[in-house]
Amino acid sequence: MDKKVLIKRFSEAIEKGNAAIFAGAGLSMSQGYVSWPELLNDPATEIGLDSKKETDLVTLAQYYKNENGGSRGILNQILMDNFGEELEISENHRILASLPIETYWTTNYDHLIEKSIREAYKNPQVKKNYTQLATTNPNVDTIVYKMHGDIDDVSSTVITRDDYEKYDDDSYALFKETLKGDLLTKTFLFLGFSFTDPNLERILSDIRWVLRENQRPHYCIMRKILKENFVDSEDFFDQERYNYELTKRRLQINDLSRFSINVVEVDDYSEITDILKSIRKKYLRKTIFISGSAVDYTPFTSESKGLKFVEKLAYRLSESGYRIVSGYGLGIGNSIVSGVLKQRRNLRKNNIQDVLSLRPLPLDMPHEWRRYRENIIAESGISIFVFGNKLESGEIVTADGMIEEFELSVQNENIVVPIGFTKGASKVLFDKIQENFSDYFDDSLKSKFQALEKLDTEGEVDKKVEQIVSLINSIQED
């Protein structure tokens, strides 16, 4: 599957509020936690086996438990030794936590997912056993389902065949039914997952049996089988084993398609980070930050005509499916709200929370303004600048706050679109982009951008609004 398709489809799922993540061991290994073969290396050696040669590691853990008189005490200690330490979260965790993803499933015992969510100033609810499934915290932002338990309750973790068989009990079956429900109603992205978990395989089979070809599409990112991984210390390349693993991967990808899981293969794990960044960028570009302030509405001949332009712009952006965030700038804030409200009213929808976010600056706390601006802009992927003037000592001057918002937008990797014909700071910023256009836009968009420099007559306001929307839509296709 082409990664551009994955980026497009999963960002759309986030926008619709039905995206979910399924995290396997690979998501944590980059930070220093061990893989299953590494975890069971010493136990396997003790009972005369080699964890690197075993594919059924659940049974290997069961064998070790059996050889220790049916006690899993030593296994519990091995888990504590390997997962008890709190490690730093990865960039991938941070990217995911920054997105409005409300559901995580994981087989990992560590705390990296919930830790990253808290660092993003969100409140996760962790459900690590079946007794917690029926309760939901009303103030929760994200639910993290830990279907194999948590290192803080090591004796309840799932690692042996005995533990997996508990999922056939009525109590543990609730976890399976909850996951089935999410797989039916949400779009999952599987990360760091090998698809060797017997519970998940049975759940996917149950869904496939019921829905047949009507299953919901899901996505997975896997690293390619690379030749360099089959070269030993003496530079001997094991062609036979390499070909075997290639064939096995091809068959696995084909098998996953039965469950409507589409696989994207990458050459290097760093590409996963790039894909997640692209997903975030694609999602954020559906949210537009409108920066502006005005006491003078030149080139318009009256304040009402200038405000009408802002209202029409907000209306058309909302109508085109964009969410708007604004600091409720001086002289334009009401018009932004009015434009969005009118568009929603035409759709017979009164709720505007999902399409408009207002974050006025605390006027009595100027020392906090930069942080407020950073937080507002971080919600968006495109910044539009209109007008940009204010009164200072009785004179109309350029709004320096808009210049700062431009700089913060660039820092946030936003696409920046100053509407040059509205003068003030917007014209200053428009000229700045003109000087080094390729630093901000693809050259193919130059004519569309330059069309925003002048307003010949007030009668062409509707035309200018359409030109702005057309430029924004073209950016989405980039």
UniProtKB/Swiss-Prot annotation:
Homotetramer in solution. The lineage of its organism: Bacteria, Bacillati, Bacillota, Bacilli, Lactobacillales. NAD(+) binds at residues 19, 110, 148. Activated by 3'cADPR. It comes from Enterococcus faecium. Has an N-terminal sirtuin-like domain (SIR2, residues 1-287) and a C-terminal SLOG (STALD)-like domain (residues 288-478). The SIR2 domain probably has NAD(+) hydrolase activity. The SLOG domain binds 3'cADPR; binding alters the protein conformation, allowing NAD(+) to access the active site. Residues 288-478 are annotated as: SLOG (STALD) domain. The gene is thsA. The active site is at residue 148. The keyword Hydrolase applies. Changing residue 293 to A: No change in NADase activity. Residues 1-287 form the Deacetylase sirtuin-type domain. Changing residue 390 to A: Slower NADase activation by 3'cADPR. It comes from the Bacteria. InterPro entries: DHS-like_NAD/FAD-binding_dom (IPR029035), Ssirtuin_cat_dom (IPR026590), ThsA_STALD (IPR041486). This is NAD(+) hydrolase ThsA. PROSITE patterns: SIRTUIN (PS50305). GO terms for biological process: defense response to virus. Belongs to the soluble Thoeris ThsA family. NAD(+) hydrolyzing component (NADase) of the Thoeris antiviral defense system, composed of ThsA and ThsB (maybe AS248_15445). Activated by 3' cyclic ADP-D-ribose (3'cADPR) but not its isomers 2'cADPR, cADPR and very weakly by ADPR; binds 3'cADPR better than 2'cADPR. Upon activation binds and hydrolyzes NAD(+), leading to cell death and inhibition of phage replication. The keyword Transcription does not apply. Its EC number is 3.2.2.5. It catalyses: NAD(+) + H2O = ADP-D-ribose + nicotinamide + H(+). Coiled coil: none annotated. GO terms for molecular function: hydrolase activity; nucleotide binding. 3'cADPR binds at residues 292-293, 330, 373, 390, 401, 405.
